[in-house]
């Protein structure tokens, strides 16, 4: 099981709680808002441990309990587009501003420039950082695609920018949601 980068496409705001018994609401995920889903925590997709941008603008952990249909949508259901790279079709997401890119180990790899895209095969997110989106390629500002590799892996992660924004109009990494 891996973590996912998700988008709320339920059509409504979904409450976020500090625990699984819903005793303390600490925020909400609005429609078309992005967040990281820590599936490794467990919860059988009923108790969903997430990382989200709270009302103070900080990253916070919490739980969505019994999510409505569409709330836990994979970001790859709403990509910016697709791109065929070396014969394989990838989902792409575009960046409003530059963002750090990391190797699979979490060590620095480089960055993606503003107005460039990243390409991935799935909605996978980081184990230690569910707010980091798993990627395979970065679009060069000079054209072409550069594989994100290192430490024996052919993928890495990009900081999707939840600490900056999480709504469709404010998140640095965006698709068509």
Protein language model features and the residues they cover:
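Generic secondary-structure boundary/loop-capping signal
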Residues: 13-14, 23, 61, 109
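SH3/SH3-like beta-barrel superfamily modules
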Residues: 25-69, 112-163
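SH3-family beta-barrel domains
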Residues: 1-18, 28-31, 70-100, 111-114, ...
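Short alpha-helix capping/helix-loop boundary micro-motifs
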Residues: 19-24, 102-107
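Residue-level detector of intrinsically disordered/flexible regions characterized by low predicted structural confidence
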Residues: 42, 86, 96, 102-105, ...
């Amino acid at each position: 099981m891996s973590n996912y980068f998700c988008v709320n496409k339920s059509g409504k705001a979904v409450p976020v709680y500090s625990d699984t018994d819903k005793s303390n609401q600490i925020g909400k995920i609005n429609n078309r808002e992005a967040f990281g889903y820590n599936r490794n925590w467990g919860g059988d997709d009923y108790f969903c441990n997430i990382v989200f941008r709270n009302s103070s603008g900080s990253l916070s952990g919490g739980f969505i309990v019994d999510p409505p249909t569409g709330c836990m949508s994979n970001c790859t259901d709403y990509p910016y587009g697709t791109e065929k790279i070396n014969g394989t079709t990838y989902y792409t997401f575009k960046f409003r501003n530059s963002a750090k890119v990391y190797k699979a180990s979490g060590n620095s790899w480089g960055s993606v420039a503003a107005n460039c895209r990243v390409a991935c095969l799935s909605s996978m997110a980081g184990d230690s950082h569910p707010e980091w989106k798993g990627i395979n390629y970065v679009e060069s500002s000079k054209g072409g695609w550069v594989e994100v590799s290192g430490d024996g892996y052919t993928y890495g992660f990009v900081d999707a920018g939840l600490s900056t924004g999480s709504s469709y109009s404010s998140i640095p990494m965006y698709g068509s949601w």
